[in-house]
UniProtKB/Swiss-Prot annotation:
Name of the protein in its database record: Large ribosomal subunit protein bL28
This protein's UniProt keywords: Ribonucleoprotein, Ribosomal protein
GO cellular component: cytosolic large ribosomal subunit
Native source species: Delftia acidovorans (strain DSM 14801 / SPH-1)
SUPFAM superfamilies registered for this protein in UniProt: L28p-like
One GO BP: translation
Family: Belongs to the bacterial ribosomal protein bL28 family.
Highest taxon of the lineage: Bacteria
Cross-referenced Gene3D superfamilies: Ribosomal protein L28/L24
Molecular function per GO: structural constituent of ribosome
A Pfam family reported for this protein in Swiss-Prot or TrEMBL: Ribosomal_L28
Amino acid sequence: MARVCEVTGKKPMVGNNVSHANNKTKRRFLPNLQYRRFWVESENRWVRLRVSSAALRLIDKNGIDSVLADLRARGQA
């Protein structure tokens, strides 16, 4: 399964590990993804999403109904 946030679309980024001697090797910066269940009152059921910590804050701010409506408008839910 891809390491992608279902709400924000955050994906792994690519960068460098830099040693004290300034040697560089490739590395990946992974998003902080968590599986979370959200109770959707309007549908009277739980919805399980794989979301980043930034998406959790977005859901707290806008509400799960608003976020799900946005996902459905994009055709992802």
